[in-house]
């Protein structure tokens, strides 16, 4: 498992500057959080990716997604602004600091730290893909990231099948 994680890290770092892979159509496959209430069905941070664009050498990352509230899909677009440490900052349901950690041609693993308006912090992992489920190797990487972020494994939710929002 350590070899897989090291390979994932090396691969991710090698591709970290190749932001062309980030752009395009994406779907949320898996979402995980240390505060399960935030990502359960109807939760404010249960979002369904649709599109990512990068501007100004990816110093600005635009993410379009849906949130389902009261059985209604609500389309939202946010712009994350690159900070000096490789993270992006944006506003949605409070302040968010996010970072793409692992990038392939068909998957992106993001971490996100949300500080809501009440001051509650939620650590998250969001995996976006082109529509395919995680491979066993990608699942191992996800579990390791969850351990590092102190997110219980039982809080990892496969939500691809619950995405009923428009393309």
Swiss-Prot record:
| Disulfide bridge partners, by residue number | 54-58, 73-165
Q: Signal peptide: which range, if any?
A: 1-16
Q: Which UniProt keywords apply?
A: Disulfide bond, Glycoprotein, Pyrrolidone carboxylic acid, Secreted, Signal
* Top-level taxonomic group: Eukaryota
**GO CC annotations, alphabetized:** extracellular space
**What role does this protein play?**
Acts as an aphrodisiac pheromone, reliably eliciting copulatory behavior from male hamster.
Designated name of the protein: Aphrodisin
Organism of derivation: Cricetus cricetus
């Amino acid at each position: 498992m350590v070899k897989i994680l090291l390979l994932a890290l090396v691969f991710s770092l090698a591709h970290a500057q190749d932001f062309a892979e980030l752009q395009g159509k994406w779907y949320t496959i898996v979402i995980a959080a240390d505060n399960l209430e935030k990502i359960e069905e109807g939760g404010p941070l249960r979002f369904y990716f649709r599109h990512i664009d990068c501007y100004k050498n990816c110093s600005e990352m635009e993410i379009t997604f849906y949130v389902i509230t009261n059985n209604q899909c609500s389309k939202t677009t946010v712009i994350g602004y690159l900070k000096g440490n490789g993270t992006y900052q944006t506003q949605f349901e409070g302040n968010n600091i996010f970072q793409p950690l692992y990038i392939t041609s068909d998957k992106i693993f993001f971490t996100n730290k949300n500080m809501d308006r009440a001051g509650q912090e939620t650590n998250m992992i969001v995996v976006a893909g082109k529509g395919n489920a995680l491979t066993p190797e990608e699942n191992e990487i996800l579990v390791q990231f969850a351990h590092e972020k102190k997110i219980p494994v039982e809080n990892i939710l496969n939500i691809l099948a619950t995405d009923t929002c428009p393309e």
